[in-house]
């Protein structure tokens, strides 16, 4: 069970709603925590942020599908040539349904959704779940991508894919990208990873995700790994797609 104690800070006038949201996810305010979930307002929009208070230079982690990096990736990224698109098997008119069982900040899921895949997301850590839920809420209301997002990206109110019924709630593809201990030299590359390591740590029970993923997947399970990582659950995939720093291991449904 992850530690759900975190400093809870409200910088808006919606303290009652923020408190209720945190209580719903079982978050406990810890005034001594260096990690803080913050409700703030930026350019007139209320959003949730994760901050590491003892390292303010890291900035905040939040989910934004409308502007910034994700908007640029949607408009000018590789599209169907993106590694994740190839890994899930997008080809011609075939757009698989996908369950992203370790959704995180929803970035890979967003790439697939923007290409037309129907993606259901599962995120078990309550703080990350709230960040993702908040980002989706703002995206659903956006004039440009709102309709697409509502149709193609759905965050499920469950903590683990084992809660899904494989016969009724499966998908063509189940996608896994569990947290993995970073090499020391790469630990500072991304602020999100540094803050996430403090919040979540490594996914020590990640191996237990593969079996339920294979049960839910109707065609394949895809596991994203750092290029130096072992196969998940020590299970050899049918084949892999290699990128500069990562590897997509593909397990076909037999």
From Swiss-Prot:
Its EC number is 2.1.1.242. It is an enzyme of class 2 (transferase). This is Ribosomal RNA small subunit methyltransferase J. Transmembrane segments: none annotated. It comes from Histophilus somni (strain 2336). The gene is rsmJ. S-adenosyl-L-methionine binds at residues 107-108, 123-124, 177. Specifically methylates the guanosine in position 1516 of 16S rRNA. GO terms for molecular function: rRNA (guanine-N2-)-methyltransferase activity. Belongs to the methyltransferase superfamily. RsmJ family. It catalyses: guanosine(1516) in 16S rRNA + S-adenosyl-L-methionine = N(2)-methylguanosine(1516) in 16S rRNA + S-adenosyl-L-homocysteine + H(+). GO terms for cellular component: cytoplasm.
């Amino acid at each position: 069970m992850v530690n759900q104690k975190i400093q809870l800070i409200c910088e808006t006038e919606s303290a009652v709603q923020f408190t209720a949201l945190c209580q719903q996810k079982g978050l406990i305010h810890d005034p001594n925590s260096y990690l803080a979930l913050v409700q703030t307002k930026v350019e007139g929009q209320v959003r949730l942020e994760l901050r590491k208070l003892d390292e303010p230079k890291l900035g905040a982690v939040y989910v934004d599908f409308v502007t910034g990096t994700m908007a640029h990736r949607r408009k000018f990224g590789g599209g169907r040539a993106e590694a994740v698109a190839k890994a899930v098997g997008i080809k011609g008119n075939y757009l698989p349904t996908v369950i992203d069982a370790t959704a995180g900040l929803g970035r890979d899921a967003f790439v697939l959704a923007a290409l037309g895949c129907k993606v259901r997301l599962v995120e078990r850590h309550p703080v990350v779940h709230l960040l993702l839920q908040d980002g989706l809420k703002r995206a659903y209301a956006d004039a440009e991508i709102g309709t697409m997002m509502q149709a193609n990206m759905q965050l499920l109110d469950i903590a683990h894919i084992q809660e899904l019924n494989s016969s009724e709630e499966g998908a063509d593809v189940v996608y896994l990208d569990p947290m993995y201990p970073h090499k020391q030299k790469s630990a500072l590359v991304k602020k999100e990873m540094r803050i996430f390591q403090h919040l979540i740590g490594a996914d020590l029970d990640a191996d237990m995700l593969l079996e339920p993923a294979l049960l839910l997947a109707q065609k394949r399970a895809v596991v994203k790994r750092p290029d130096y990582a072992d196969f998940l659950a020590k299970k050899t995939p049918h084949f892999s797609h290699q990128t500069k720093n990562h590897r997509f291991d593909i397990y076909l449904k037999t």
